[in-house]
């Protein structure tokens, strides 16, 4: 099958388009300190950032969603993260040039993430990023790995799904794509 030029490019956010690990690790460590625990090395947290709050709470506090304190701790983590959303978060190296080139070529690009919409949109605004479409984990009834978010993004762009490239860093991205 010959490689075709895409009509749009969609990116996962955390760990793909943006290096959010420093701010997410700092927020998890603040929560750990509040809970009387020692901070974890950021390098130990980084591999789990793509798993969102659930994954970070699992490695940082050893709790899962069935734990009675999970929701309260998740809410506290997200509040801490919201306070420090874009302190150290940046585009991964080279992606600033890629985004500029996509804009220059008038090739639409967007974000499809499982991150909550409020955090996603504030983060994109803080970094002065203006994707053509943004689909977040709480925008639809089903998030990735279900394909609905990608199909919804294609619909918003008015493009056939098979004319769009999707770039992600996790198995859920592959399954969704």
What kind of feature is each model-predicted range?
Residues 2, 112, 142:
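Residue-level marker of regulatory loop/turn positions in helix-turn-helix DNA-binding domains and
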Residues 2-97, 104-105, 116-121, 130:
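N-terminal helical cap/lid subdomain that shapes the substrate entry/recognition surface
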Residues 10-12, 112, 167:
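Generic enzyme active-site microenvironment
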Residues 87-90, 116-176:
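Substrate-recognition "cap/lid" segment bordering the active-site pocket of phosphatases
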Residues 96-104, 154, 174-175:
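Surface-exposed amphipathic alpha-helices with a cationic face
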